[in-house]
């Protein structure tokens, strides 16, 4: 469990030092701690409040750096996005977070509705009966998928081998 709210999260500098050293960013924060442990996790749930129809800046900075420097540790592992908003913008933020998973070859875990709850405060979110049911269903679906992956491993079924990535710029 890592929280981008628990400490300052530095934005990505674009210097590439984390990829070169394999030790994360030269700035030590919660992202480095997460990346160091990311390979031990079976699956991931990333959550964010919705700010202006987007995930929070703290989570975006966290995920930018975590996936750039440690994405290979998460490849093939199931992930889910959860968003919380007062009124609107949840589907845009939900989509934004899911893009990190799909570009990293991660199975995306869904629920009976988009993984969102509504309320301005925790007490209000608890009153969102459909949202809370969606969260329970998400938890059950994540547990089921993790069980399926484990059963597959026991039968010798592994994650598909990836081809070397081909990068093409649109302007040459």
Please describe what each predicted stretch is.
Residues 107-172:
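Glycine-rich phosphate/pyrophosphate-binding loop and the adjoining helix
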Residues 1-10:
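Single conserved hydrophobic/aromatic residue that forms the stacking wall/gate
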Residues 6, 62-64, 150-153:
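Short amphipathic alpha-helical surface micro-motifs
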Residues 13-15:
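Short, charged N-terminal beta->alpha structural module
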Residues 10, 20-116:
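Helix-loop-strand module that forms the ligand-binding subsite of alpha/beta enzymes
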